[in-house]
Amino acid sequence: MLLEFTKMHGLGNDFMVVDLISQRAYLDTATIQRLADRHFGVGFDQLLIVEPPDVPEADFKYRIFNADGSEVEQCGNGVRCFARFVHERHLTNKTNITVQTKAGIVKPELGQNGWVRVNMGYPKFLPNEIPFVADEPEALYTLELANDQNISIDVVNMGNPHAVTIVPDVLTADVAGIGPQVELHKRFPERVNAGFMQVIDDKHVRLRVFERGVGETLACGTGACAAAVSGMRRGLLANSVEVELAGGKLQIEWQEGDVVWMTGPTTHVYDGRLDLRYFQG
């Protein structure tokens, strides 16, 4: 069967977006892995699925699958692309939409020239909300790694779990070595996204993220939210912060006790069609 899709990206964090309202398809783990292959498939960090909502207050249901086929709760760069996609495909004429995710409701607002502002919901910090194994809540936790190496982390759930550590320079940070150890650490029973943040000043940080089930990506929207909120909680950052990632910049806003707002661009790369039979086992 032929499957129509759109390739999009948010700051280089790239997606295959599929409308399963107007067409039908079954995409299992192995099929998603084959589609994600950058040599033999479409190639992407995440697959984004548009479905009818299960709850009356939502306009759409938004499902996210990593390149390894695992389904995750949230993707910040993805929800911006999702919002642009449903509007450009005329699935809605709204510019403010309500989207159901595994993590709850998010509310993207479409702006000009592909920019989207998203209400990302409330951050969570308690260990059981991440989830993270700890005897009691603390401002920072020490994580033991291989070769007697320890790092200090904050933990934040932005619809998906994040560990944030501050580094002197993101360019020299050992993301490839430390990232997988943090992602798969036994204290994170559902694995975790590992963020490495360099504070430039109180309104500007640089960030690299090793994403759960993907590896390091050019940008991570929920990771940017988690890092900014972590810095704000520590008193290091103002309430509105520019987060600089390899793929570009996001603006993150947060007030204690309120929702997190993320603003950033989207890019529509191309529309495609493929014969799904070649990717199914």
From Swiss-Prot:
SUPFAM superfamilies per UniProt: Diaminopimelate epimerase-like
Keyword Heme: no
Classification via NCBIfam families: DapF
EC category: isomerase
UniProt site (Important for dimerization): Y270
Residues the record marks as site: Could be important to modulate the pK values of the two catalytic cysteine residues: H162, E211
Binding residues for substrate: N13, Q46, N66, G76, N77, N160, N193, E211, R212, G221, T222
Phylogenetic classification of the source organism: Bacteria, Pseudomonadati, Pseudomonadota, Gammaproteobacteria, Moraxellales
The protein's name in its UniProt record: Diaminopimelate epimerase
